[in-house]
Amino acid sequence: MAAAALMTMSALTGCSGKQAVQAVDLTAVSFDEIQKKAKEEGQIASVGMPDDWANWKGSWEAITEKYGLKHEDTDMSSAEELSAFDSEKDAPTKDMGDVGQAFGPQAVDMDVVQPYKATVWDSIPDWAKDPDGKWVISYLGTMSSMANTANVSEPLDSWEALKNSGCKVTLGDVVRGASAQMAVLSCAYAFGGGTDNLEPAFQFFTELAKEGRLDAGTYSLERMTRGEIDVYLTWDYLTLQYRDLAVEAAPDINIACHVMSDGALQSGYALVINKYAPHPYSAALAVEYLLSDEGQIDRARGYARPIRSDVELPSDLAEKMIPDEEYADAIPLTDNEAVSAACAEIASRWEEEIIPLMN
Protein backbone atom coordinates (compact mmCIF):
# COMPACT_ATOMS: atom_id res chain seq x y z
CA MET A 1 0.00 0.00 0.00
CA ALA A 2 1.42 3.37 -0.97
CA ALA A 3 1.96 5.92 1.76
CA ALA A 4 -0.97 8.24 2.17
CA ALA A 5 -0.72 11.97 1.76
CA LEU A 6 2.03 13.44 3.88
CA MET A 7 2.73 17.16 3.94
CA THR A 8 5.80 18.26 5.82
CA MET A 9 7.91 21.34 6.30
CA SER A 10 11.68 21.05 6.24
CA ALA A 11 13.92 23.84 7.47
CA LEU A 12 16.18 25.53 4.94
CA THR A 13 18.71 28.24 5.59
CA GLY A 14 18.19 31.33 3.46
CA CYS A 15 20.76 33.88 2.31
CA SER A 16 19.86 36.15 5.19
CA GLY A 17 20.88 33.47 7.66
CA LYS A 18 17.32 33.12 8.95
CA GLN A 19 15.45 29.82 8.82
CA ALA A 20 12.66 29.44 6.26
CA VAL A 21 10.34 26.51 5.61
CA GLN A 22 9.52 24.82 2.35
CA ALA A 23 6.66 22.40 1.80
CA VAL A 24 7.60 18.89 0.74
CA ASP A 25 4.68 17.05 -0.83
CA LEU A 26 4.96 13.31 -0.22
CA THR A 27 1.48 12.50 -1.49
CA ALA A 28 2.71 10.25 -4.30
CA VAL A 29 5.63 8.73 -2.43
CA SER A 30 5.50 4.97 -1.96
CA PHE A 31 6.37 3.20 1.26
CA ASP A 32 9.52 1.91 -0.43
CA GLU A 33 10.51 5.50 -1.14
CA ILE A 34 9.83 6.46 2.47
CA GLN A 35 12.21 3.73 3.61
CA LYS A 36 14.86 4.92 1.16
CA LYS A 37 14.53 8.57 2.18
CA ALA A 38 14.50 7.69 5.89
CA LYS A 39 17.75 5.81 5.46
CA GLU A 40 19.24 8.92 3.90
CA GLU A 41 18.03 11.05 6.82
CA GLY A 42 19.50 8.53 9.25
CA GLN A 43 18.04 9.98 12.43
CA ILE A 44 14.85 10.86 14.28
CA ALA A 45 14.04 13.03 17.29
CA SER A 46 10.94 12.25 19.34
CA VAL A 47 9.26 13.91 22.30
CA GLY A 48 7.30 12.31 25.12
CA MET A 49 8.48 8.77 24.37
CA PRO A 50 10.95 7.91 27.17
CA ASP A 51 12.60 4.50 27.47
CA ASP A 52 10.79 3.51 30.68
CA TRP A 53 7.25 4.18 29.41
CA ALA A 54 5.24 1.44 27.64
CA ASN A 55 8.46 -0.20 26.43
CA TRP A 56 9.40 2.62 24.06
CA LYS A 57 12.98 1.52 24.61
CA GLY A 58 12.26 -1.81 22.93
CA SER A 59 10.70 -0.14 19.90
CA TRP A 60 13.42 2.45 19.39
CA GLU A 61 16.11 -0.21 19.67
CA ALA A 62 14.26 -2.27 17.05
CA ILE A 63 13.87 0.75 14.74
CA THR A 64 17.57 1.54 15.06
CA GLU A 65 18.51 -2.06 14.32
CA LYS A 66 16.03 -2.50 11.46
CA TYR A 67 16.40 0.85 9.70
CA GLY A 68 19.64 2.30 11.02
CA LEU A 69 17.99 5.42 12.45
CA LYS A 70 19.80 7.16 15.27
CA HIS A 71 17.23 8.16 17.89
CA GLU A 72 16.95 10.65 20.72
CA ASP A 73 13.98 11.59 22.89
CA THR A 74 13.10 14.56 25.06
CA ASP A 75 10.49 13.72 27.67
CA MET A 76 7.63 16.23 27.73
CA SER A 77 3.97 16.42 28.64
CA SER A 78 1.45 16.31 25.80
CA ALA A 79 0.85 20.06 25.99
CA GLU A 80 4.59 20.74 25.97
CA GLU A 81 5.05 18.55 22.89
CA LEU A 82 2.55 20.51 20.81
CA SER A 83 3.91 23.80 22.10
CA ALA A 84 7.41 22.74 21.02
CA PHE A 85 6.20 21.85 17.52
CA ASP A 86 4.66 25.31 17.22
CA SER A 87 7.42 27.38 18.81
CA GLU A 88 10.18 25.70 16.78
CA LYS A 89 8.44 25.86 13.41
CA ASP A 90 11.05 28.21 11.93
CA ALA A 91 13.93 26.08 13.21
CA PRO A 92 12.44 22.64 13.95
CA THR A 93 14.31 19.99 15.92
CA LYS A 94 11.55 17.46 16.76
CA ASP A 95 10.01 14.96 14.36
CA MET A 96 7.22 13.21 16.21
CA GLY A 97 5.57 12.67 19.56
CA ASP A 98 3.16 10.62 21.65
CA VAL A 99 0.31 12.65 23.14
CA GLY A 100 -2.70 11.92 25.29
CA GLN A 101 -5.82 11.00 23.35
CA ALA A 102 -7.54 14.36 23.81
CA PHE A 103 -4.50 16.20 22.48
CA GLY A 104 -4.78 14.63 19.02
CA PRO A 105 -7.69 16.84 17.92
CA GLN A 106 -6.03 19.77 19.68
CA ALA A 107 -2.90 19.23 17.56
CA VAL A 108 -5.05 19.42 14.43
CA ASP A 109 -6.67 22.64 15.65
CA MET A 110 -3.21 24.11 16.29
CA ASP A 111 -2.12 23.06 12.79
CA VAL A 112 1.17 21.61 14.02
CA VAL A 113 0.83 18.04 12.72
CA GLN A 114 0.76 16.43 9.30
CA PRO A 115 -1.03 13.37 7.90
CA TYR A 116 0.33 9.89 7.47
CA LYS A 117 -1.68 6.71 7.15
CA ALA A 118 0.30 3.55 7.84
CA THR A 119 -0.26 0.45 5.74
CA VAL A 120 -2.30 -1.09 8.58
CA TRP A 121 -4.65 1.91 8.72
CA ASP A 122 -7.79 -0.09 8.02
CA SER A 123 -7.20 -2.34 11.04
CA ILE A 124 -7.33 0.61 13.46
CA PRO A 125 -10.80 1.52 14.81
CA ASP A 126 -12.29 4.69 13.35
CA TRP A 127 -12.66 6.29 16.78
CA ALA A 128 -8.92 5.87 17.37
CA LYS A 129 -7.68 7.88 14.40
CA ASP A 130 -8.07 11.19 12.65
CA PRO A 131 -9.88 10.63 9.33
CA ASP A 132 -7.16 12.60 7.55
CA GLY A 133 -4.36 10.70 9.27
CA LYS A 134 -3.06 13.54 11.44
CA TRP A 135 -3.08 11.47 14.63
CA VAL A 136 -3.56 7.82 15.48
CA ILE A 137 -3.85 6.06 18.83
CA SER A 138 -1.35 3.24 19.18
CA TYR A 139 -2.13 1.95 22.69
CA LEU A 140 -4.55 2.26 25.60
CA GLY A 141 -4.42 2.44 29.37
CA THR A 142 -7.36 1.46 31.61
CA MET A 143 -7.96 2.07 35.32
CA SER A 144 -7.22 -1.08 37.29
CA SER A 145 -6.47 -2.49 40.72
CA MET A 146 -3.53 -4.48 42.04
CA ALA A 147 -4.13 -6.31 45.30
CA ASN A 148 -1.91 -8.27 47.65
CA THR A 149 -3.91 -11.47 48.01
CA ALA A 150 -2.33 -12.15 51.40
CA ASN A 151 -4.29 -9.13 52.65
CA VAL A 152 -7.37 -9.35 50.40
CA SER A 153 -9.31 -12.60 50.04
CA GLU A 154 -11.83 -11.63 47.33
CA PRO A 155 -11.07 -10.39 43.77
CA LEU A 156 -11.19 -6.60 43.66
CA ASP A 157 -12.60 -6.33 40.15
CA SER A 158 -15.22 -3.63 40.81
CA TRP A 159 -15.76 -0.58 42.98
CA GLU A 160 -18.65 -2.40 44.63
CA ALA A 161 -16.32 -5.25 45.58
CA LEU A 162 -13.81 -2.74 46.87
CA LYS A 163 -16.49 -1.03 48.96
CA ASN A 164 -17.43 -4.30 50.64
CA SER A 165 -13.92 -5.70 51.02
CA GLY A 166 -12.86 -3.96 54.22
CA CYS A 167 -9.37 -3.41 52.82
CA LYS A 168 -7.35 -0.19 52.89
CA VAL A 169 -7.09 1.65 49.56
CA THR A 170 -3.95 3.32 48.21
CA LEU A 171 -4.41 6.04 45.59
CA GLY A 172 -1.33 8.19 46.01
CA ASP A 173 -1.41 11.98 45.81
CA VAL A 174 -4.93 12.85 44.66
CA VAL A 175 -4.30 16.59 44.95
CA ARG A 176 -1.44 16.53 42.44
CA GLY A 177 -1.44 13.13 40.74
CA ALA A 178 -3.26 12.65 37.44
CA SER A 179 -3.63 8.88 37.75
CA ALA A 180 -5.05 9.18 41.28
CA GLN A 181 -7.55 11.75 40.05
CA MET A 182 -8.54 9.38 37.24
CA ALA A 183 -9.18 6.70 39.86
CA VAL A 184 -11.55 9.03 41.71
CA LEU A 185 -13.29 9.94 38.45
CA SER A 186 -13.64 6.24 37.59
CA CYS A 187 -15.32 5.74 40.95
CA ALA A 188 -17.78 8.51 40.15
CA TYR A 189 -18.80 6.72 36.96
CA ALA A 190 -19.18 3.43 38.84
CA PHE A 191 -21.85 4.87 41.11
CA GLY A 192 -23.80 6.86 38.53
CA GLY A 193 -21.78 10.06 38.31
CA GLY A 194 -19.28 11.41 35.82
CA THR A 195 -17.28 14.49 34.95
CA ASP A 196 -20.25 16.71 35.78
CA ASN A 197 -21.20 14.86 38.96
CA LEU A 198 -18.43 13.80 41.32
CA GLU A 199 -20.67 13.46 44.35
CA PRO A 200 -20.93 9.62 44.21
CA ALA A 201 -17.14 9.33 44.35
CA PHE A 202 -16.81 11.74 47.26
CA GLN A 203 -19.53 9.92 49.17
CA PHE A 204 -17.62 6.67 48.58
CA PHE A 205 -14.23 8.02 49.68
CA THR A 206 -15.70 9.98 52.59
CA GLU A 207 -17.05 6.71 53.96
CA LEU A 208 -13.71 4.97 53.42
CA ALA A 209 -11.86 7.80 55.15
CA LYS A 210 -14.20 7.68 58.14
CA GLU A 211 -13.61 3.93 58.37
CA GLY A 212 -9.83 4.45 58.30
CA ARG A 213 -9.58 2.68 54.96
CA LEU A 214 -7.76 5.36 52.95
CA ASP A 215 -3.98 5.02 52.89
CA ALA A 216 -2.31 8.41 53.33
CA GLY A 217 0.90 7.11 51.77
CA THR A 218 1.94 6.52 48.18
CA TYR A 219 2.77 3.32 46.34
CA SER A 220 6.28 1.93 46.49
CA LEU A 221 7.75 -1.47 45.78
CA GLU A 222 9.09 -1.65 49.31
CA ARG A 223 5.69 -0.98 50.87
CA MET A 224 4.00 -3.55 48.66
CA THR A 225 6.51 -6.30 49.39
CA ARG A 226 6.34 -5.55 53.13
CA GLY A 227 2.59 -6.11 53.02
CA GLU A 228 1.74 -2.50 53.86
CA ILE A 229 -0.49 -2.04 50.81
CA ASP A 230 -3.75 -3.94 50.38
CA VAL A 231 -4.84 -2.55 47.02
CA TYR A 232 -3.47 0.14 44.71
CA LEU A 233 -5.43 1.79 41.90
CA THR A 234 -3.77 3.12 38.74
CA TRP A 235 -3.43 2.42 34.99
CA ASP A 236 -3.21 -1.23 33.95
CA TYR A 237 0.16 -0.86 32.25
CA LEU A 238 1.53 0.27 35.62
CA THR A 239 -0.22 -2.28 37.85
CA LEU A 240 1.02 -5.13 35.66
CA GLN A 241 4.55 -3.76 35.60
CA TYR A 242 4.51 -3.21 39.36
CA ARG A 243 3.19 -6.76 39.84
CA ASP A 244 6.21 -8.18 38.02
CA LEU A 245 8.62 -6.04 40.01
CA ALA A 246 6.99 -7.09 43.28
CA VAL A 247 7.20 -10.78 42.42
CA GLU A 248 10.82 -10.35 41.36
CA ALA A 249 11.65 -8.68 44.67
CA ALA A 250 9.56 -11.05 46.81
CA PRO A 251 8.91 -14.38 45.02
CA ASP A 252 6.34 -15.51 47.59
CA ILE A 253 4.04 -12.52 47.10
CA ASN A 254 0.87 -12.97 45.04
CA ILE A 255 -0.52 -9.92 43.26
CA ALA A 256 -3.91 -9.95 41.49
CA CYS A 257 -4.64 -7.29 38.87
CA HIS A 258 -8.14 -6.49 37.60
CA VAL A 259 -9.98 -3.85 35.59
CA MET A 260 -12.76 -2.23 37.61
CA SER A 261 -15.78 -3.64 35.78
CA ASP A 262 -18.29 -1.03 36.96
CA GLY A 263 -16.11 2.03 36.43
CA ALA A 264 -12.80 2.00 34.56
CA LEU A 265 -11.75 5.01 32.55
CA GLN A 266 -9.72 4.25 29.45
CA SER A 267 -7.38 6.66 27.73
CA GLY A 268 -5.26 6.26 24.64
CA TYR A 269 -2.04 7.82 23.44
CA ALA A 270 -1.74 9.14 19.91
CA LEU A 271 1.23 9.24 17.57
CA VAL A 272 1.67 12.59 15.84
CA ILE A 273 4.18 13.79 13.24
CA ASN A 274 5.40 17.35 13.51
CA LYS A 275 4.20 19.42 10.55
CA TYR A 276 7.68 20.95 10.46
CA ALA A 277 9.61 17.70 11.07
CA PRO A 278 13.27 17.95 10.00
CA HIS A 279 13.25 14.18 9.32
CA PRO A 280 9.71 13.52 8.03
CA TYR A 281 10.49 10.27 6.24
CA SER A 282 12.02 8.84 9.42
CA ALA A 283 8.95 9.91 11.38
CA ALA A 284 6.63 8.22 8.88
CA LEU A 285 8.75 5.08 9.00
CA ALA A 286 8.65 5.08 12.81
CA VAL A 287 4.85 5.38 12.79
CA GLU A 288 4.74 2.49 10.33
CA TYR A 289 6.80 0.31 12.66
CA LEU A 290 4.93 1.33 15.83
CA LEU A 291 1.60 0.30 14.29
CA SER A 292 2.97 -2.92 12.82
CA ASP A 293 2.53 -6.28 14.53
CA GLU A 294 6.06 -5.95 15.94
CA GLY A 295 5.47 -2.46 17.28
CA GLN A 296 2.14 -3.38 18.82
CA ILE A 297 3.68 -6.37 20.56
CA ASP A 298 6.37 -4.01 21.89
CA ARG A 299 3.61 -1.95 23.55
CA ALA A 300 2.13 -5.09 25.08
CA ARG A 301 5.54 -5.99 26.48
CA GLY A 302 5.26 -2.69 28.33
CA TYR A 303 1.74 -3.81 29.40
CA ALA A 304 -0.02 -1.14 27.35
CA ARG A 305 -2.94 -2.55 25.35
CA PRO A 306 -2.29 -2.40 21.61
CA ILE A 307 -4.89 -0.51 19.62
CA ARG A 308 -4.98 -3.20 16.94
CA SER A 309 -7.17 -6.12 17.98
CA ASP A 310 -5.97 -8.21 15.02
CA VAL A 311 -2.47 -8.54 16.45
CA GLU A 312 -1.96 -11.92 18.10
CA LEU A 313 0.20 -11.65 21.19
CA PRO A 314 2.73 -14.39 21.98
CA SER A 315 1.14 -16.87 24.37
CA ASP A 316 3.62 -16.18 27.16
CA LEU A 317 2.80 -12.47 26.98
CA ALA A 318 -0.97 -12.89 26.64
CA GLU A 319 -0.99 -14.95 29.83
CA LYS A 320 0.48 -12.01 31.76
CA MET A 321 -2.15 -9.51 30.60
CA ILE A 322 -5.53 -8.85 32.19
CA PRO A 323 -8.12 -10.92 30.23
CA ASP A 324 -9.84 -9.15 27.33
CA GLU A 325 -13.31 -9.68 28.78
CA GLU A 326 -12.52 -7.42 31.73
CA TYR A 327 -12.25 -4.48 29.33
CA ALA A 328 -15.75 -4.87 27.88
CA ASP A 329 -17.25 -1.93 29.80
CA ALA A 330 -14.23 0.37 29.93
CA ILE A 331 -15.17 4.05 29.56
CA PRO A 332 -13.18 5.97 26.93
CA LEU A 333 -12.08 9.51 27.73
CA THR A 334 -13.01 11.83 24.88
CA ASP A 335 -13.73 15.29 26.31
CA ASN A 336 -10.44 16.77 27.47
CA GLU A 337 -11.97 20.00 28.77
CA ALA A 338 -14.57 18.17 30.86
CA VAL A 339 -11.94 15.81 32.28
CA SER A 340 -9.58 18.68 33.11
CA ALA A 341 -12.36 20.54 34.92
CA ALA A 342 -13.32 17.39 36.83
CA CYS A 343 -9.72 16.77 37.87
CA ALA A 344 -9.39 20.33 39.15
CA GLU A 345 -12.54 19.86 41.21
CA ILE A 346 -11.30 16.49 42.49
CA ALA A 347 -8.00 18.03 43.63
CA SER A 348 -9.61 20.92 45.51
CA ARG A 349 -12.41 18.90 47.06
CA TRP A 350 -10.05 16.11 48.10
CA GLU A 351 -7.88 18.60 49.95
CA GLU A 352 -10.87 20.24 51.61
CA GLU A 353 -13.14 17.26 52.29
CA ILE A 354 -11.14 14.02 52.41
CA ILE A 355 -7.68 14.79 53.75
CA PRO A 356 -9.01 16.22 57.05
CA LEU A 357 -10.84 12.93 57.62
CA MET A 358 -7.60 10.97 57.16
CA ASN A 359 -5.67 12.79 59.90
Regions inferred by a protein language model and the residue ranges of each:
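A short alpha-helix/helix-coil micro-patch that ends at or immediately precedes a cysteine
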Residues: 59-67
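Extracytoplasmic/periplasmic substrate-binding proteins
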Residues: 214-276, 311, 315-320
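Short, low-complexity disordered leader/linker segments with a strong preference
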Residues: 1-41, 359
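Short, solvent-exposed beta-strand edge segments and adjacent coil->beta transition regions
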Residues: 41, 140-142, 266-270
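Extracytoplasmic "Venus flytrap"
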Residues: 23-32, 39-58, 269
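Mature extracytoplasmic/periplasmic domains
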Residues: 264, 269-334
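Extracytoplasmic ligand-binding site segments that recognize negatively charged/polar headgroups
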Residues: 45-60, 72-86, 90-229, 242
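Conserved C-terminal helix/tail region of periplasmic/extracytoplasmic solute-binding proteins
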Residues: 27, 328-359
